[in-house]
């Protein structure tokens, strides 16, 4: 059984999520201890438990220690169950997108349909529009297709969002994403839920003003939804090059003007573009598991503590070599074979 110290590296939930994904894919059981030991609320929290429960349902796994506050978990997966529907409710504003990242690599070509309820646009995780505009589009470039249906948005703290992920199929193989290529267009989605529509317009216009100096077409849509459980706003942007995509997002909050939200996302996007990387900070982390499974190389905008921790966890499950050139927290090249 693979032993994992949950306090290693950044010491957060990413260690657990990566372990769950690779355990289900490889069939290797693991024991993780010191879960989130150095965090303000140590041990498993509700949203971490739903990642465990989701992967448990997918693989008919045996578990021990899967309860709120537990600092140790044993996870023994069995064969992945295909042709099935799974419902996951992470509660209030638990992150839907972190669940998507955990389950998606394990359900490729398995005909699994997953309905996830919780927070679609919440702090400390990619927004659902980032997932749609950037994450899924980059996966398409490496041979993985997925259908994501956004039914309801959920913001912190009430949540109430709902998405369905299905038709995750493909024939992924070794890939090389070493440059963005010529920038062709910037796409985006500016949204509001149960708030005045002009907020989405102001976010969009603010971002557009800053991005106009890049000299490429800008297509930002607005998504205005009234009657949602939670109130909130945000914007996600995708700079689409001939070979890859760079993304960024920003969320509104009480007291934060809509213009600041749009400006923030635009400046983050430009900062990532200026690194000359092939993928942004979010994808620098998220692409690593796919490069590890299929072989791949890419240039990430920043070698974060998440990415570094991911490398070490991945090597516990897979017999691979990870060659990284670059120093934290700067641009880096990852080659995995």
UniProtKB/Swiss-Prot annotation:
Record flagged with keyword Ribonucleoprotein: no
EC number from the UniProt entry: 6.5.1.4
Coiled coil: none
Localization in the cell: Cytoplasm
One Pfam match: RTC_insert
Binding site for ATP: 101, 282-285
Signal peptide: none
InterPro entries in the cross-refs: RNA3'-term_phos_cycl_insert, RNA3'_phos_cyclase_dom, RNA3'_phos_cyclase_dom_sf, RNA3'_term_phos_cyc, RNA3'_term_phos_cyc_type_1, RNA3'_term_phos_cycl-like_CS, RNA3'P_cycl/enolpyr_Trfase_a/b, RPTC_insert
Annotated Gene Ontology cellular component terms: cytoplasm
Active site residues of this protein: 306
Function: Catalyzes the conversion of 3'-phosphate to a 2',3'-cyclic phosphodiester at the end of RNA. The mechanism of action of the enzyme occurs in 3 steps: (A) adenylation of the enzyme by ATP; (B) transfer of adenylate to an RNA-N3'P to produce RNA-N3'PP5'A; (C) and attack of the adjacent 2'-hydroxyl on the 3'-phosphorus in the diester linkage to produce the cyclic end product. The biological role of this enzyme is unknown but it is likely to function in some aspects of cellular RNA processing.
Protein name in UniProt: RNA 3'-terminal phosphate cyclase
Gene for this chain: rtcA
């Amino acid at each position: 059984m693979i032993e994992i110290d949950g306090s290693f590296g950044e010491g957060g939930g990413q260690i657990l999520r990566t372990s769950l994904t690779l355990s289900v894919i490889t069939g290797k059981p693991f024991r993780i201890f010191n879960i989130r030991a150095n965090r303000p609320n140590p041990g498993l929290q509700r949203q971490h438990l739903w990642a465990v429960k989701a992967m448990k349902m997918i693989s008919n796994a045996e578990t021990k220690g899967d309860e709120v506050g537990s600092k140790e978990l044993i996870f023994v997966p069995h064969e992945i169950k295909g042709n099935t529907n799974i419902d996951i409710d992470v509660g209030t504003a638990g992150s839907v997108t972190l669940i998507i990242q955990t389950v998606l690599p394990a359900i490729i070509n398995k005909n699994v349909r997953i309905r996830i309820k919780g927070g679609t646009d919440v702090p400390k995780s990619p927004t659902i529009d980032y997932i749609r505009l950037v994450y899924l589009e980059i996966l398409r470039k490496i041979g993985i297709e997925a259908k994501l249906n956004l039914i309801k948005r959920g913001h912190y703290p009430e949540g109430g969002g709902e998405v369905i992920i299905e038709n995750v199929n493909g024939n992924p193989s070794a890939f090389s994403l070493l440059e963005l290529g010529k920038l062709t267009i910037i796409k985006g989605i500016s949204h509001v839920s149960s708030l005045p529509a002009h907020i989405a317009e102001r976010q969009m216009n603010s971002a557009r003003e800053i991005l106009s100096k890049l000299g490429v077409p800008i297509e930002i849509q607005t998504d205005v939804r009234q009657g949602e459980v939670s109130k909130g706003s945000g914007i996600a942007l995708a700079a689409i090059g001939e070979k890859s995509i760079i993304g960024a997002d920003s969320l509104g909050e009480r007291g934060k003007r809509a213009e600041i939200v749009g400006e923030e996302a635009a400046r983050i996007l430009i900062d990532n573009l200026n690194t000359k990387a092939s993928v942004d900070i979010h994808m620098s982390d998220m692409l690593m598991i796919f490069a590890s499974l299929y072989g791949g190389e890419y240039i990430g905008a920043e070698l974060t503590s998440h990415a570094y921790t991911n490398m070490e966890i991945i090597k516990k499950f897979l017999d691979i070599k990870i060659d990284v050139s670059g120093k934290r927290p700067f641009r880096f090249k990852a080659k995995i074979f």
